């Protein structure tokens, strides 16, 4: 392709992604766009086509982003190349959204005609505006009985400042308004900028591992041209590789001669280690490198940590391999080895939030066949010791003794909740109970209120979202962002079984709630841990002080069942023998702890 062809091609490229709150019909709209541009054979079409994981289809959510190239014959007679980059909608996967947006010039903002704007819609709009993207507003599901497109149009104008006239009304399910959306993409989304003659600059926005071909990186070319045979260099790591193949997704992978300015495709360069092709890195030519890497990609740090332990110890190395493979596609997943007296060897693993944690656990069990025990999640606490030293603690078992600590800081988040008027009281009460600090409240319209609180992250990660949903009959929507670490009066609570600490059950709690949480947990453990042949005391302790205690009664075993009549001394001898055996068993302290017991720490608020 010569210089002029590249310039001509560039003006007909449109790169866009679809952003929406979870369940507003984003994946269905992506399906309709694929269908209407005849990108997929009718026989290959299935719902949620771009959601390639079984888990995504089952839960009906998008977890991984996906990029696909489409051809569209517009009414002006020109043929346009669309690159659609599908994004997740759940708050935990904001980093996936920020990656997609960095590779686009425009975004279709999908809003449900019945639900209206929700908390995550706003969060994604702000992300899009940060990336200077053109917004194309679409009100979806207009054929629902409860749809109120005019009210939602007004909302878009009042809350986001979008002109009502620019809004497209559609129903992805019934294929209404899809043609208007395609025409609007041509009109609203600007063609990519960039010089095909300049040194190569390409953004890696996703990567996956293929056992035969190595790492396959999804890229968006910002400047220059890349083709097979080129020697490339990663700007963050300085590593060099030779390109073996470049191609596009249609949604199937298809190799092409070259990728030039504005193209979204994939690149394979015999990269064996995922760390060498990091998401957010810039690719350039080794011989003629670009001066500076691309800006605009945010590294997401894990917010929630938990221990993952294989039920069978011999799976330890397989678990490491599984985590490494998942980390390939998931730049925000972090892990390091840890050992626990109760659970043996495993990994302390960091996630973006609770849904992220659940999904990673489920993928390890499904895709790699490793059965896991997971400990209750915790967040990172900063401790300033009396010696002046500063320590970060992501595992409650490693918290220094209270008498050595000067101050403890815990992470706080700004939580934005959109709630119907009738439930404002219940939501505010929930936030106060979770140690929240009221910041602001504004009425969006006659029906809904936007409430903002600052809440400790440790209170949010447990079951805040579930409780918010149940307190509002499922109508609330929720989004949060990390703001800062703040000083808190926290203590570490240990759980003792049979007089021995179980490190995997330790947790950190606010001093004010220590007694009631300790009491709730020991009562819960009493019901979850099976009865042993001897009585087992369950205690909750803060430092040396026991704050709550209960006993798991022993299982009665009738050793006299085979004694029919006979001498009383014979019976006494059998009972003495049983007593000695129980004492020995108790000394060893082998209490079987089921997985539910470790998760009980999570569910303490539900009773």
Curated annotation (Swiss-Prot):
One of its GO terms (cellular component) is plasma membrane. One of its GO terms (molecular function) is GTPase activity. PROSITE patterns: G_TR_1, G_TR_2. It is found in: Cell membrane. One of its GO terms (biological process) is positive regulation of translation. Gene3D superfamilies: 3.30.70.240, Elongation factor 4, C-terminal domain, Elongation Factor G (Translational Gtpase), domain 3, P-loop containing nucleotide triphosphate hydrolases, Translation factors. Keywords: Cell membrane, GTP-binding, Hydrolase, Membrane, Nucleotide-binding, Protein biosynthesis. Its EC number is 3.6.5.n1. The keyword Transcription regulation does not apply. SUPFAM superfamilies: EF-G C-terminal domain-like (SSF54980), P-loop containing nucleoside triphosphate hydrolases (SSF52540), Translation proteins (SSF50447). GTP binds at residues 23-28, 140-143. Pfam families: EFG_C, EFG_III, GTP_EFTU, GTP_EFTU_D2, LepA_C. Residues 11-193 form the tr-type G domain. Required for accurate and efficient protein synthesis under certain stress conditions. May act as a fidelity factor of the translation reaction, by catalyzing a one-codon backward translocation of tRNAs on improperly translocated ribosomes. Back-translocation proceeds from a post-translocation (POST) complex to a pre-translocation (PRE) complex, thus giving elongation factor G a second chance to translocate the tRNAs correctly. Binds to ribosomes in a GTP-dependent manner. Belongs to the TRAFAC class translation factor GTPase superfamily. Classic translation factor GTPase family. LepA subfamily. This is Elongation factor 4. The gene is lepA.
């Amino acid at each position: 392709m010569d210089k002029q062809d590249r310039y001509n091609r560039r003006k007909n490229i449109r790169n866009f992604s679809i952003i929406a709150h979870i369940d507003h019909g984003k994946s269905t709209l992506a399906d309709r766009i694929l269908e209407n541009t005849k990108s997929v054979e009718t026989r290959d079409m299935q719902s949620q086509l771009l959601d390639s994981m079984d888990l995504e289809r089952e839960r009906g959510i998008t977890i991984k982003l996906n990029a696909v190239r489409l051809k569209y014959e517009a009414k002006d007679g020109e043929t346009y190349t669309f690159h659609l980059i599908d994004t997740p909608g759940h708050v935990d996967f904001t980093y996936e959204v920020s990656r997609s947006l960095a590779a686009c010039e425009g975004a279709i903002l999908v809003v449900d005609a019945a639900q209206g704007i929700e908390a995550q819609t706003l969060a994604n709009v702000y992300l899009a505006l940060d990336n200077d993207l053109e917004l194309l507003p679409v009100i979806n599901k207009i054929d629902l009985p409860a749809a109120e497109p005019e009210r939602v149009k007004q909302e878009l104008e009042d809350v986001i400042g979008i002109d009502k006239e620019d809004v497209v009304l559609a129903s992805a399910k019934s294929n209404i308004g899809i043609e208007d959306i395609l025409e609007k993409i041509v009109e609203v989304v600007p063609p990519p900028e960039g010089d095909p003659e300049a040194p190569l600059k390409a953004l890696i926005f996703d990567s996956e591992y293929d056992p035969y071909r190595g790492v396959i990186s999804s890229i968006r070319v910002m400047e220059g041209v890349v083709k097979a045979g080129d020697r490339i260099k990663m700007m963050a790591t300085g590593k060099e590789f030779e390109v073996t193949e470049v191609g596009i997704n249609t949604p199937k992978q298809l190799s092409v001669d070259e990728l030039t300015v504005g193209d979204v495709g994939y690149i394979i360069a015999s990269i064996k280690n995922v760390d060498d092709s990091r998401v957010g890195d810039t690719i350039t030519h080794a011989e003629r490198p670009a001066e500076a890497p691309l800006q605009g990609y945010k590294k997401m740090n894990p917010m929630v940590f938990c221990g993952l332990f294989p039920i069978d110890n011999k799976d330890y190395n397989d678990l490491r391999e599984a985590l490494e493979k998942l980390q390939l596609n998931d730049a925000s997943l972090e892990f390091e080895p840890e050992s626990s007296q109760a659970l043996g060897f495993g990994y302390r693993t960091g996630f973006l939030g609770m849904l992220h944690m659940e999904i990673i656990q489920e993928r390890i069990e499904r895709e790699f066949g490793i059965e896991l025990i997971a400990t209750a999640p915790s967040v990172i606490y900063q401790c300033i010791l009396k010696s002046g030293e500063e320590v970060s603690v992501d595992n409650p078992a490693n918290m220094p003794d209270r008498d050595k600590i000067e101050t403890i800081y815990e992470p706080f988040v700004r939580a934005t909740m959109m709630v119907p008027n009738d439930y404002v009281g219940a939501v505010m009460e929930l936030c106060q109970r979770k140690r929240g600090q009221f910041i602001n409240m504004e009425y969006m319209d006659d029906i809904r209120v936007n409430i903002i609180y600052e809440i400790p992250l440790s209170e949010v990660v447990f079951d805040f979202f579930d409780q918010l949903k149940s307190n509002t009959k499922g109508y609330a929507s929720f989004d949060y962002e990390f703001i800062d670490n703040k000083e808190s009066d926290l203590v570490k609570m240990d759980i003792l079984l049979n007089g021995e600490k179980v490190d995997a059950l330790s947790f950190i709690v606010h001093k004010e709630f220590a007694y009631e949480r300790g009491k709730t947990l020991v009562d819960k453990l009493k019901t979850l841990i099976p009865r042993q042949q001897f009585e087992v005391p369950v205690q909750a302790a803060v430092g040396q002080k026991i704050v709550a205690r209960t006993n798991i009664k022993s299982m009665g075993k009738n050793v006299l069942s085979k004694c029919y009549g006979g001498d009383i001394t014979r019976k006494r001898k059998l009972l003495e023998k049983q007593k000695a055996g129980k004492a020995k068993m108790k000394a060893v302290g082998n209490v079987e702890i089921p997985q539910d017991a470790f998760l009980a720490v999570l569910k303490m608020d539900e009773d």
